[in-house]
Amino acid sequence: MKILSLYCGAGGLDEGLKQAGFKTTLAIDINKDACETMKLNHDCEVINGKVSDYESSFGDFDIIIGGPPCPEFSRANKNRTFNSCEVDLFWSIVDRIKPSFYMMENVQDVIRVVNRDNYLVNVSDYGVAQDRLRRIFTNLPLPKSRNKKTLYDVLGNTGFDYLTDFAFPNRNQKCPSRNMSEISMTLTTMKHFYLTSIPIYTRKYLPKEKHVWLNKDKTSLTNGKPCREITHKERAMIQGFPEDYVFYGNDVSIRKQIGNAVPPPLANAFFSQIQIPITVLNKGNAK
């Protein structure tokens, strides 16, 4: 089956289809880093450009997916104006090509300008460890709720030895010259080390009293359970990406790619329902 992925971003929808047994044929996005991420994870043709510049060249496809960027509808945008932005272009392509299946994902308020069959879903019902409402436009039926997960289910076994893909690349190493499972009984030689990296099972060696280092350039430990920022890998796993999914770009770019992505388990839940008709299979094999 031929699959067209419009506004593919980091490939959340594509990964969901992949897990359901499908493979994207052509993907397009205006963001260069997102396109590189797609290339690293999906064996398909990827175009870095505007959908409007290529729409007339799109031929027949069996499935069309996409998540058009529409910040006008985001509730985080306090100056919202309800224009149709890229969604009209998405639907014009769907209406022209007439694929067997289609799916558009967006924020819930996009319903104000789109009069199509849709579902308002909470991604937590489909194996994503988030309470997040999304609007899904598709000709597929609403899948049953499945695989509810907590953050512990997703991140509980991520381990400690190395904080790979940490937001700051110079902070992902173990404590210099010693294993953190055998940390010093005192903090004299570790005073300026990043204490937020110390795992729970070794914190018994830390001073019991609470204390703070009032220096903006030094680590501050205020209680027995210091918190660190989650890594990019952990952010992606919370979105439902597999642990080995690779993201391309700098810190800010990767954060945006992960945050804007459609959770793969959501797409997987919808497309794993497809029982492909023989006529569709023959149509796909003939191309």
Where are these regions (language model features)?
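C-terminal target-recognition/interaction regions appended to catalytic cores
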Residues: G159-K287
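Conserved SAM-binding strand-loop segment of SAM-dependent methyltransferases
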Residues: D43-V51
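Short alpha-helix immediately C-terminal to the canonical SAM-binding loop
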Residues: K32-E36
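Conserved SAM-binding loop of SAM-dependent methyltransferases across substrates and taxa
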Residues: A10-F22
